[in-house]
């Protein structure tokens, strides 16, 4: 029973959770489709807030300790948010790429490895 490490994100130390939050924000900030949607106002006047809500939804998804994390579910979360918030179908493969980056980053953070995040910062 692992009850000793229940911070903001199951399995992640407070430092790892903070670094993952930083890294996930960087991944989403570099996602061209999302940034185009925000810059062009595809979500209306609240496009920036909708992008922020997506970032929060991603962190919440990773915080769910009740079920295993499957990349298909993360892809669906990203895809549905783009459709519902920005009326945008993403068919360039970037949803899958972003989901994969986030899953790898989360796995790395579980192991205390922040190399991917450091690369995004630099």
Give, region by region, the residue ranges found by the protein language model:
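Extended alpha-helical interaction segments
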Residues: 1-63
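Short acidic, glycine/proline-enriched loop segments that cap or flank alpha-helices
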Residues: 42-47, 61-74, 85-94
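Alpha-helical bundle protein-protein interaction modules that mediate dimerization/oligomerization
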Residues: 73-122
């Amino acid at each position: 029973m692992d009850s000793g490490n229940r911070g903001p994100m199951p399995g992640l130390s407070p430092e790892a959770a903070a670094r993952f939050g930083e890294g996930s924000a960087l991944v989403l900030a570099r996602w061209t489709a999302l940034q185009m949607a925000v810059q062009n106002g595809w979500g209306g006047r609240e496009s920036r807030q909708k992008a922020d809500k997506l970032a929060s939804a991603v962190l919440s998804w990773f915080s769910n300790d009740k079920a295993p994390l499957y990349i298909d579910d993360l892809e669906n979360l990203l895809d549905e948010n783009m459709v519902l918030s920005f009326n945008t179908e993403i068919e360039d493969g970037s949803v899958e790429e972003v989901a994969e980056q986030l899953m790898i980053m989360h796995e790395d953070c579980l192991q205390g490895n922040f190399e991917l995040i450091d690369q995004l910062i630099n």
